[in-house]
Amino acid sequence: MMAAKRTANRRRRQVIDPRIRAEVIAKWGDRCWLRLPGCTGAGEEDDHIVPWSHRGVDSVANIRRACKHCNAMRQDRVLSGYGATIHCVIGPPTADLIGYAADYMRYDSVMVAHSEFARVLSCDDDELAGKKAVRLAAALAWDAAYRQLARTQTPLDVWLIRTLPRSRSHPDMLAEWIAFDYDIHVVDPGAEQVFDTVDNAADEQVARQWYAMGVTQASVCARLAQRHAQLVQLGLRNGTTAHDDSLEW
């Protein structure tokens, strides 16, 4: 019974009035709006900006075209501000990412940090927190928290704290964050200070991976500006300032 209901729901989401689809293509174009890593660019499917899970409707304002790859990869994540407003703080080991975020967080902000998950799991035992099993559990907790908060319709203020913006399942997480127009902060005290400060081989390896990525605040801002301009053209952002716009239906 439940399987049949899920199948019916999938069919319902895929059925769009051809007249609405024609209007969407005429107004917003027939190219993929998501631009996630691996995007083909083709407008192959109808995608709800506000998903069905958020009670999104079949309307020209709420539908854009998407390629099959991006539509599947999206997994009901929404643009920053269409549910939670998401900020990301990234940087090499020893950079004070949490301290940086704390200066900007609101009293009711939500923070997702691997180190905090590890601290809670180990009951503040630093040696235990460094164990592989605990670190893996913390990583899984981070991933689960991100998946939930990226899809929520609750207007939360969320701060994602992470060293490397990538994982096995999301090898180009940074590009995904840019596609969803997250507010991204790069905190990097510089390679010399980082390598002088790291005190173990694991952190040194992560630091080398970080600098091999070549991530800088300037490069991230340039990519975000380009993405924001695309979203303005698609009618999904207003004005010229990223992250704080809201769509009027």
Task: Give a label for each model feature.
Residues 1-34, 53-57, 80-82:
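Short, charged surface segments at domain edges that flank catalytic/cofactor-binding sites
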Residues 34-65, 74, 78:
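Histidine-centered nuclease catalytic patch
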Residues 71-85:
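Extreme N-terminal, non-catalytic leader segments
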Residues 82-87, 154-156:
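Pre-Walker A (Motif I) flank of P-loop NTPase domains
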Residues 85-105:
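Glycine-rich phosphate-binding P-loop
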Residues 98-157:
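Conserved substrate/cofactor phosphate-moiety recognition/catalytic segment
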